[in-house]
Amino acid sequence: SPHSFILYKTYKMENKIVALIDADSLIYYEMGKETLEIALDGIDSRINQMLQITGATHYAGFLTQGKCFRYKVAKNRPYKGNRKYGDKPIIFPAIKEYLKQKWGCTVITQLEADDLVSVFHKDKTTIICSPDKDVLYQNIGSHYNYGKAELVVVTKLDAIRFLWKQVLMGDSTDGIEGLPKVGPKTADKLLELVQPLDMPEFVLNKYIEKFGISNGIDKFAETFKLIYILKSQEDVLRETGIELPELVTYDVESQKENEWL
């Protein structure tokens, strides 16, 4: 239950508990509301609920701005090329700006919010808040899925298995090509008896079996880079050449006080 989650986190970490908020989805959840005022109230309500349920003392929010590095990595198919965006509602930019101004959400060029919450995640002292399966299941620790309002606990083995399962399958949502005719059940079956340390080589060999050595290695590398969520400063430097600034967090109690000003 949410209450046991708070007790668990407080017991584990007596001092600072930082909620790392992947704020992209918040905009999509609220942009269909009748008025901007209702949408912004919805944003406040959702974030306050997150902070309360996770028992966070501090928070940091992140947004995606423009195209990330994965658009250049994708050679076989355009990254997220199958998404039908259409025209965004007129209140979309206002909600995004509100998240930056009111809640201090950060944007870093070339990186998705997914990457940013993951890079700053420190297992025992942070809680990732996101509805995104890749963010939740590629990171070890206790996370909060704010789309389903539920706690997700991910072990090291869970995270390794999820990553390699996704590399086998690809991700149709983001237009990422995997092995042909490999869905969740087939991927699970293929990895069933494979030890975690052997998974990279095993999956690479499956690509080589299907596409030949040269093509197989290229396709494997591309799919891996598109699926893999960056998790360290080294990852970020390698993929983008960017040196990340220090994490700035906001005090939850101070934010509550500001609401009365």
Ranges and model annotations:
Residues T10-Y11, G81-W260:
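Extended two-metal-dependent nuclease catalytic cores across DNA- and RNA-processing enzymes
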Residues F5, Y71-V73, R161:
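General helical secondary-structure elements
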